[in-house]
Amino acid sequence: MSVKWTSVILLIQLSFCFSSGNCGKVLVWAAEYSHWMNIKTILDELIQRGHEVTVLASSASILFDPNNSSALKIEIYPTSLTKTELENFIMQQIKRWSDLPKDTFWLYFSQVQEIMSIFGDITRKFCKDVVSNKKFMKKVQESRFDVIFADAIFPCSELLAELFNIPFVYSLSFSPGYTFEKHSGGFIFPPSYVPVVMSELTDQMTFMERVKNMIYVLYFDFWFEIFDMKKWDQFYSEVLGRPTTLSETMGKADVWLIRNSWNFQFPYPLLPNVDFVGGLHCKPAKPLPKEMEDFVQSSGENGVVVFSLGSMVSNMTEERANVIASALAQIPQKVLWRFDGNKPDTLGLNTRLYKWIPQNDLLGHPKTRAFITHGGANGIYEAIYHGIPMVGIPLFADQPDNIAHMKARGAAVRVDFNTMSSTDLLNALKRVINDPSYKENVMKLSRIQHDQPVKPLDRAVFWIEFVMRHKGAKHLRVAAHDLTWFQYHSLDVIGFLLVCVATVIFIVTKCCLFCFWKFARKAKKGKND
């Protein structure tokens, strides 16, 4: 489309925006990697509808280039970290998480807590850099934004919302142990049938699995800290000039947009200010580049396999790469492998390596037979959207849980990255490609994903616009946020009722004893007479 026609369309959109009075100003607290990709999809749609979107990003941000022309307005605040330092730090922590042994529950989650705490320290530093920059804060405040939008896993947006007195909306995939969802959002997760995230359990639990799930619940509720909460609580209290906590401030969110859906997640109760918008980034496939299309077409009736371990995994040992390449070389399908490393010695003629692939477009291609994935939520939703069965090789975070969900739905097979042999991967591929049940099951999930009265992206945008129109959505916020923990669990009421029952029992007992004493005394007196 020419620049002329683009300008005309933009002018029409803006004219409609101003005439309807629905044009708003959205402030965004930046996220990184897949977290940003999900938010970016929503922001692009907001811009298409004529809203003004401004993103607050640090000078170290990996995904933002202030010189890159974009409809997004980027406000860069200075920080002492460099892009390279931040990227290296993130990659080091991800590798550390991926390499954690899962043999011991306590050791594994203690290490996860330490990693999350380090991430929290970096995020808190960025937050301090913003709120301590008086000139920058004044500039932002004078812009008079209507709403703040952010990923809840990167705190600070709620502090800005409190300082600027504007409503805010969260986007969130998950937090370890549902920490933020439960303690800040007031979400309800009955442990009898809702498995704790990262437990790799399903909603069909045996007695011993329910015992295991309860242990997870108790651990995450009373021991695990997603960040160093004391530091965050102290920081927020100092900035706001009154005692407060991170959880309390996050609990003031008007709407939570959870990047999940019921064809993926096991059912549990939802609050009025929570909506599921999983798969909002999914869209119909576009034509492939000619060279890639020619390779796909050369596969004939056998079709192709798409293989990607995501954007956050850039280093793989030569030994692991050769194990994988050897398995891929033995299947009749052609393979498109996203791999940014040295060419494996065992690479077959049927396999091509790419530093980047148009994953959504490949998954939507009619010749795609299977998807080898690390289990990232974005990739899984794209596979569901296009109806492609999966072989899961989870690495860290929620990925094992995601693959467990797909296994429970009969849409995936799992292999272990560190211990799998070429035969293991080969058998898994043959199973999902040759067993028609996997294709049937994932197509069922796909039909559910498509059969929605309102698309997830439209729902996400609706709620942000709703909050802007009504200057918040406090009428949807449950009163549980205003209760103490013992009031929430009705411990004060239970205690009062127990005292009442005990009092009644005491009085009745005393009355019975008194009556017994009176009758006994009368009987004794009559006997003496």
From Swiss-Prot:
Disulfide bond positions: none
Cell location: Endoplasmic reticulum membrane
Membership in a protein family: Belongs to the UDP-glycosyltransferase family.
Gene Ontology process terms (BP): androgen metabolic process; estrogen metabolic process; lipid metabolic process; xenobiotic metabolic process
PROSITE patterns, sorted: UDPGT
Membrane topology (UniProt): Single-pass membrane protein
Annotated phenotype, changing G379D: Abolished androsterone glucuronosyltransferase activity; reduced hyodeoxycholic acid and tetrachlorocatechol glucuronosyltransferase activities
Official protein name in the record: UDP-glucuronosyltransferase 2B7
GO molecular function: glucuronosyltransferase activity
Protein species of origin: Homo sapiens (Human)
One GO cellular component term: membrane
InterPro entries hit by this protein: UDP-glycosyltransferase, UDP_glucos_trans, UDP_glycos_trans_CS
Residue positions with a glycan: N67, N68, N315
